[in-house]
Amino acid sequence: MCSSDLQIQEFKANLIRPTNYVDVLTLNLFDEFCSFLDQKKFLRHPSMLKYLMEKEQSAPSKVKSTQDTLARNAHSPEFVQFIHQRIIDHITIKDQYRRPYVFMYGIGSMYPYLRVNEFLALYEDYNETDKYKIIVFYPGHRDQNSFRLFDTLPDNHTYRATLLINE
């Protein structure tokens, strides 16, 4: 685990204390994407992820085709549904904990296949804001109502999100 993973897990652990009774779902979007691809069959191959990795190794000239396939799958309704099902499975657990938050991170690892604004736009039809809130840990900084990925790449999209930590 890298330091940001540890920080997010520590933050989650602090919320589950008996005085809070909050159980947060933490989703590394990149890891979830890899799981999605690994479970997805492709032609006669049981795992699209393994197929794409083998293809990239054996045919470096086909890297563009592999990247296009990754981007197409990252934007697919099936991937969005996969994430939604993970969230629904978590928030519907019946026990003493409240589950009002989903921590989403690993967004930077998805670049250039998927950007945070693209994912949030794709997920908007699924989002049930009365049941849970998605909190995105973003590798960059806010510039007015837009963000700069890795403090380098301008996003040029306006967000309705609220900044939780004052700069």
Where are these regions (language model features)?
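Short His-Asn-centered micro-motif
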Residues: L27, M104-I107, F137-G140
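Long, charge-dense
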Residues: L25-E78
